[in-house]
Amino acid sequence: MYGSSEFIFNVFGFLILAGIILDKMGIRFTGVLSASLMFIGASIKYYGVSDAFIGSGIETWLNSWWVSFPGSAKLASLGFMIFGCGMEMAGITVSKTIAKWFEGKEMALAMGLEMAIARVGVFAVFTISPWLANMAPATVVRPVAFCTLLLLIGLLTYVVFTFMDRKLDKQLGLDAKGNNSSEEEFRVSDLGKIFGSKVFWIVAMLCVLYYSAIFPFQRFATNMLESNLGVSAQTAADIFRWFPMGAAAITPLLGSYLDHKGKGATMLIFGAILMTVCHLIFAFVLPAYPSTLIAYGAIIILGISFSLVPAALWPSVPKIMETRYLGSAYSLIFWIQNIGLCLFPAVIGYALKFSNPGHIDGTAYNYTLPMVIFASCGVVAMLLGIWLKAEDRRKHYGLE
């Protein structure tokens, strides 16, 4: 329940509303709103896990219903829901912001640097949080407080950015919402144009298939390595946690290549192929030849794939969608992606249970079937990439 609470509002339509707000109100308002939601959500979660919550009237009321689910978990889930809304809204706002500031310039490099910094941040938090939690006395409150502080710094940083963006609008002759007064404004009916675009659906389905084989895989990766290599959970986690760092190092370089040489659709195809190869190695090679060297090799391949696809995918959206509804286009892609990310872990969990009947706790799992399912997503994503390349050749979007 807690793990899925981050996606609940987004799957049930908040992301669509977020895109409309972004296109109607502009990047400054939406950015501050999204950063505020993340900070508020984290603050609620912090209160829910802190000692101040224990014995409070809120705890008494929350524990009076659905007694099998602790009151602290209920409040933390509420905070995580609010945080999740802000996080996804921030994602589409950052994408549209970079598209605005770097249109006609090094947009793919800028997006690559943004993704690289984000992945370094994820690595840092996953490294620092356990250390903070295990400091005497051990408590989960400390890392939550640390992350809440980071979100406050992020909110203040974006407020500073709004002054810079307002100055840019004056230089470009844009209105208060960052729009060109001579261009047609966003209308809610523009959502129909997005849904009616064939190339939008190709990109959206490629996105959901690719990321469904990345993020849900991360949930199972540690146990998969533990089962295949016969190592401890900590050792397996230490092997896999370097995956985002490899992607962070390569993504800006690929973004720069995309800006100067193109080949965006080709990069998507190769990224999907590499992901398929990685999951097939985990499905068949690693179980037959348990080796940390093979595991690291497959993770490096996945890291290159995770650089190729995002570096080419997100800068491609402004080329296929009009600027006035670009925010809604990003939000709808994120919305479709969130549906996949909500459902796919359950599919993999069922496949794992199906292929391991009568599994005894403490023994290794057979991950062949789940890895084949992940690889199948890569195959379909590759075919969609080929289709996208053909559409680009016909319609001249400029992806290549």
For the regions a language model picked out, list residue spans one by one.
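Cytoplasmic helix-loop-helix junction between adjacent transmembrane helices
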Residues: 73, 77-117
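C-terminal transmembrane helical hairpin of 12-TM major facilitator-type secondary transporters
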Residues: 264-313
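Helix-loop-helix hairpin linking two adjacent transmembrane segments in secondary transporters
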Residues: 114-169
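Extracytoplasmic gate region of multi-pass secondary transporters
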Residues: 197-251, 310, 344-345
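Flexible cytoplasmic inter-helical loops of multi-pass small-molecule transporters
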Residues: 160-189, 395-400
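Cytoplasmic membrane-interface "Motif A"-like loop-to-helix N-cap segments
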Residues: 23-35, 259-273
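Central cavity-lining transmembrane alpha-helices of secondary-active solute carriers
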Residues: 4-20, 241-254
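C-terminal ends and interior cores of transmembrane alpha-helices
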Residues: 36-68, 273-289
